[in-house]
């Protein structure tokens, strides 16, 4: 007979197991992904789902894939056609994006921040310097002027005082909104959780943007399913392969009368906001000119020089506003060769952006690396010390090998344009191009991601004493010297053939 204490212990253990399973399901982890980080076999990934709209489409990678699920991210590719507008949307997770192709303008809505972009040109039929008036105010304007002529001097002074106060409170703005910025090929765009953003394609080709949501980020207080919240637009095709019902914007769920009272509009207009019969999707085509208040487009060199002024931290060019969340920069172009962190004329270049170059990344805890590898070149073997890496090929092809913690090769494939590779934290990898160039963008789940190389001048092997190397690998002292000192580069090298370069031939920044 089983004793009562033993039975209680067994029952308690079963309850703990069931509670763990229910908790995992409540976090959005499907039962088949109970061991989501079993990464013994990685693969090159492509989009599995496409959501089409009137003026573009959004392609999604399966976020239930064990590799993507383990990294705690969700990846999508947004294609906006010429004249297309990606309607205001926000997410429960922070988002980092890279503009692969094209140009446009984008805006974000930061709650609590003022509208700092204003168009002060008067409306049609409005005199310069006078506040805007509605239709009723215009109809009664003549009567008010006649009444003013009959008033005494004291009444005129009192009315002028009231008009002056109203003029200070309400100026003749046609429109006023939060910050609008130009975006172009090579831009990194960072968006905080809960901040709505929109994008309009101003170019003559499709605007292509690769996006990453960090759904494991501390800012996401929901489950590990990517959730899209729309201020406008809809998704008539459903949210995913498992969720086929139509998704409406957030205003659709309110009673139209309540919405009309909140916005002080009529019920008919409130129903228009709910887009009940609109099937255009979340990317719509703009008919006619798209007129928003925006600054003129800078020259690329002038823009970078303004963002990164030379001189000490207390430079006179720094006005101190960049530390506020309302005016904090969200864009940084990392495709300019002059911005390269590592540059070798015959091999390629690597550029990183982190919280030091784009402070908002410290808040969302993400960073990015842009790389261009020429033919017959190699990125020396390395691993990420404190981040997962999601590598996306923007051009060309290359061979990528990944080794796990057991020393097993878990990936050895050719990666081509439009494909994705997840490289978990601590997994060593090497990138090798052949005849074709290889270009990529990597998103990393740390604001200041660090790497450690396994070969080269700053590698882990270079830092070890010769005696440690000889005893670890059972080799001679001369062989240990060759292992330590034959590769003089730090990041990029030749992929095949040739003799080791002299230090004088290395050009790295």
Curated annotation (Swiss-Prot):
The modification Phosphothreonine is found at residues 116, 445, 487. SUPFAM superfamilies: RmlC-like cupins. Keywords: Disulfide bond, Phosphoprotein, Seed storage protein, Signal, Storage protein. Residues 124-172 have a biased composition (Low complexity). SMART domains: Cupin_1 (SM00835). The keyword Ubl conjugation does not apply. GO terms for molecular function: nutrient reservoir activity. The modification Phosphoserine is found at residues 53, 97, 352. It comes from the Eukaryota. Residues 1-23 form the signal peptide. GO terms for biological process: seed maturation. InterPro entries: 11S_seedstore_CS (IPR022379), 11S_seedstore_pln (IPR006044), Cupin_1 (IPR006045), RmlC-like_jellyroll (IPR014710), RmlC_Cupin_sf (IPR011051), Seed_Storage-Functional (IPR050253). Residues 119-175, 230-249, 301-321 are annotated as: Disordered. Disulfide bonds join 37-70, 113-326. Residues 42-271, 332-481 form the Cupin type-1 domain. It holds the Pfam family Cupin_1. PROSITE patterns: 11S_SEED_STORAGE. Hexamer; each subunit is composed of an acidic and a basic chain derived from a single precursor and linked by a disulfide bond. Belongs to the 11S seed storage protein (globulins) family. This is a seed storage protein. This is Cruciferin CRU1. It comes from Brassica napus. The lineage of its organism: Eukaryota, Viridiplantae, Streptophyta, Embryophyta, Tracheophyta.
